[in-house]
Design a protein with these regions (language model features):
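Catalytic alpha-helical scaffold of carbohydrate-active enzymes acting on polysaccharides/glycoconjugates
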Residues: 3-4, 13, 19, 23, ...
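A short C-terminal boundary segment appended to hydrolase-like catalytic domains
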Residues: 254-255, 259-387
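Active-site environment of divalent metal-dependent phosphoester hydrolases
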Residues: 19-22, 58-61, 95-109, 126-131, ...
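Conserved beta-sheet core of the metallophosphoesterase superfamily
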Residues: 86-89, 200-261
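Binuclear metal-dependent hydrolase catalytic cores centered on His/Asp/Glu-rich metal-binding motifs
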Residues: 22-38, 72-73, 136-184, 204, ...
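Active-site-proximal segments of metal-dependent phosphoesterases and phosphodiesterases across multiple
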Residues: 61-83, 183-215
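Active-site-proximal beta-strand elements of phosphoester/diester hydrolases
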Residues: 10-16, 141-149, 185-187, 237-240, ...
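Active-site neighborhood of phospho(di)ester-bond hydrolases with catalytic His/Asp-centered motifs
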Residues: 13-15, 50-55, 87-95, 118-123, ...
Length: 387
């Protein structure tokens, strides 16, 4: 068969796919039906390629790096859960691939190679990490460009890690990839957790990817379903939720993680159709949503998608969201020591307001906003953290 016969290539794209204590045995035995259910497994079995974000190093050693945030890992035996979803492609451009250092990522890459599992998005250096993945079948070529925001795991010219999003390189990389493919899909690992809309800057980045030739841009990492924007010649999905990531850390975020989206892509030489398949979290993994559940999920999704058609809404919603988070960021400037916490309690949790005034807020804004101060401040902090 060749493309002239009208072949339709079908892909399913899921987001974060992580074994945890509750379902680890199912991964190790490759019992994928117990993880995803019979109906969902049927969809994957009919797919030309199943794409997921491998949000965890697969390693038996414990070599955690210094970072702010959780160091995830999963035993190498859990590889069988992924292998059971062949044909599979795993993306590694995320904020956890280097959680257990060079050792953990090296073990992961070697394990994927041993089990003949396609992957991209991380490597020995940025040159290796930025290499796209091209999937071709029946004359249809789809290129995947994978990148992650800077959060302790990105590669450099000389160090191992994930492909970093870079405003000087990433858009040009997508433009070059499009010249060799029929279609380009960008998987951008970024955006703020548990926020269902794009920030103004994230929206600009994603639109720029489309301007450079991307047919589909999916923002992963937010752990919740966001909103969709059909922009220019492409589609942007600002958050699709987890695929399987049954973490106790989500105990206070059940409303966000209860449902997710699979993104279905049906491509021919002449068309590229994108649709959403709602799924629901279960105790052990995930399953296809019922008709009523799917209606509930998609109705809310479509409402949010209507909201972001208004540029003012995108700006105002993000301003309001920032108001709920800024104190958390500022607390780091006064420290976490027991003495500080005790004094803060003594002053009715208002120590920050007493220590930081208008001048301090303006200075912090300048240090973060001005390119020269931002670069110098960040370099200095990194130097301190390496001592």
């Amino acid at each position: 068969m060749n493309w002239e016969s009208g072949y339709t290539l079908k892909l399913y794209i899921g987001a974060d796919f992580v074994p945890t204590d509750i379902n680890r045995e199912l991964f190790e035995t490759g019992n994928v039906e117990a993880l995803v259910g019979k109906e969902l497994l049927g969809l994957f079995n009919q797919s030309d390629l199943n794409v997921f974000n491998l949000e965890v190093p697969l390693t038996d050693a414990s070599t955690p790096i210094d970072k702010f945030g959780n160091n995830l890992k999963s035993p190498t035996k859990t590889i069988y859960g992924y292998k059971a979803l062949e044909p599979i492609f795993l993306t590694l451009a995320n904020n956890h691939c280097l959680d257990h250092g060079v050792e953990g990522l090296t073990t992961t890459l070697e394990l994927l190679k041993k089990h003949d599992i396609k992957n991209a998005g991380a490597g020995a250096n940025v040159k290796e990490a930025k290499k796209p993945f091209i999937f071709e079948k029946e004359g249809i070529r789809i290129g995947f460009y994978l990148c992650a925001e800077h959060e302790f795991t990105v590669a450099s010219c000389h160090t191992m890690g994930a492909n970093p999003f870079d405003v000087l390189d990433s858009f040009d990389d997508v433009e070059a990839l499009k010249k060799t493919c029929d279609y380009v899909i960008v998987l951008y690992h970024g955006g703020k957790e548990f926020y269902r809309y794009p920030s103004p800057m994230l929206q600009r980045y994603c639109r720029k990817f489309v301007d450079k030739g991307a047919n589909l841009v999916i923002c992963q990492h937010s752990h919740c379903i966001g909103s969709r924007e059909d922009y220019g010649e492409g589609t942007i999905i600002y958050g699709q939720g987890n695929f399987i990531f049954n973490s106790e850390s989500y105990i206070n975020h059940k409303e966000f993680v209860k449902d997710s989206l699979l993104i279905r892509v049906e491509a021919t030489k002449d068309s590229f159709i994108i649709s959403e398949v709602p799924i629901r979290s279960t105790e052990m993994g995930t399953r296809l949503a019922t008709e009523s559940e799917a209606d509930e999920t998609l109705t809310a999704y479509k409402q949010r998608s209507e909201h972001i058609r208004d540029a003012h809404f995108v700006v105002q919603a993000y301003k309001d969201f920032a108001d709920t988070h800024v104190k958390r960021y500022l607390r780091e400037f006064i420290g976490r020591s027991f003495i500080i916490r005790a004094i803060n309690a003594l002053f009715g949790r208002k120590l920050m307001q007493l220590l930081l005034g208008k001048t301090s807020y303006l200075a912090i804004q300048n240090y973060l906003e001005c390119e020269a101060h931002h670069e110098l401040f960040l370099r200095g902090i990194k130097n301190i953290n390496k001592k």
